[in-house]
């Protein structure tokens, strides 16, 4: 029955405690460290959650401390806990170990005496009212440090709760050596003690009953006290009765499970299974279960001291303040701990400083290298993205597809990277320029494999004709003729496409013919060989290639000379291929005045005979050494072709032959006759390039068997001259 009663009362008290603490925890203790709160008086420290003063100085009324009104308002000696009406001896916070999971407050408790007064009829006397720590929200409980003590001969002490449940001890009057007064133990002789039950009561009273020992008369005293404050070698009850009180130890705690209270503290939540928390945490709170009471208490971690129940209340302990903490070594205080560092001599100190400087410089160096590497990476990434964008826009994917589907073409051409060509041309430096034309700029440079190439960078690109442009690249990459400049590859990763050709060292034919060179190499034999080579190359393009190709811009500036003055046709910027069943192309007029076919100029229909006409103008240049357009003839309204045909008509062709080749007039006149046929106004009356090539080969190989008599074609030539003059005059 006793156990059931305790259990029921304990459960009710615990529930009330949780309810009260839950309500008080709703508001974090934000202002408890206010300067208006007095934290000491009477030499006693009053840490939060206890407090004196306004309501913000303590957690709730259970922790309120006031001064005893009986002392005329003085708060120096008698601080009281108002809710239990007890004078405070001292207050301590929970210690940082699992064996002290609660705080402690020592109070003054009553002393019950019997027979100590001159007026024996007074019976039992109590110096103070019985202790009662019950009530809604009470955080207090009796700790197991307390004992029920009875002092005096034959004293029978009884401890009762509100319902008079009895627990006690009885002292003896037998004087034996084992029970000598001086043995400092309260073990039965004139003094006995009893432990409190596991289920400690919240309200207690102490009574004294007499036993049958005749020697038990006299002064008797009984009280509840903390054994820390009990002088066990004193067995005179008068002493305790005169003192008027005994020190009782109360444990206290409050529930911080509500995160609204715990989180503002900044404490770490722990359980018994927590590991090495004390090495790193400043403030800790833990949940526990003690004497059927659930609690949560907070404390400062290892290396810290102070009050964990206020934010920032745990302060680092400076262990180095202890003398000789590290012996001869240097003590260095750290957060929550300390370290002993061997003393550094001057050389070692200098080395240490130098080491620190070196580490700093290395760190700075690595930082700079890292930033530079990141910059290079971002720049490279942007360049790759930009190159891929241009590659797709310039038809790179289509070119790759076509190169891989055509037999052998992959080996005959190459797709260069923009990085490779930028490096080869010093980022397209002006110092590397070979020449500039209407289609773009040509640069000379050596590739990584040591080969010298000509890099042509286009000026503009027509995106609508990109597919046609890619088809032409594929086609030109398959041309393999000794008198045609070889297209080595291209680069499509730039804003405008770049073409890479084989490098031809001796420049173009135009400069060799018309600039003031002391060039003894431009003999008639060389000129005739150049004509034969160009005619053969054009014949190959018109008939022998996979698809007929019309150059559309045959002129002496597009005829290059290698180191042995062998001719090579270049600049296919306006070239077009046609299907084998096509006879002409209808395009916008493109070409160079002075070389342009008048029939193409009027009809916009370009045929292979248009290339024949342009080649005829080149033959006239080789014969006369004249430019296709000159200031004198321009004022007269005629070009080189008209000028030549007039001279042929008037039988004065010899007069316009270049003075440097007049000694070869017979061969020259044979070529002049062929040139006149190439310049026929009607394209269908012109020879094709195969016929022209065969005729030139015959002239070159059989110079003695030439028939150079001019045929009577005056009427037809009259028509030609009139038509040509009309075109150029317009």
Curated annotation (Swiss-Prot):
Main localization (coarse): membrane
Record has ATP-binding as a keyword: yes
Tissue: Preferentially expressed in roots and flowers.
Residues that hold ATP according to the record: 434-442, 456
Position of the signal peptide: 1-25
Chain segments carrying region Disordered: 703-730
GO cellular component: plasma membrane
Record-listed E.C. numbers: 2.7.11.-
Segments crossing the lipid bilayer: 358-378
Protein name per its UniProtKB record: Wall-associated receptor kinase-like 3
Native source organism of the sequence: Arabidopsis thaliana (Mouse-ear cress)
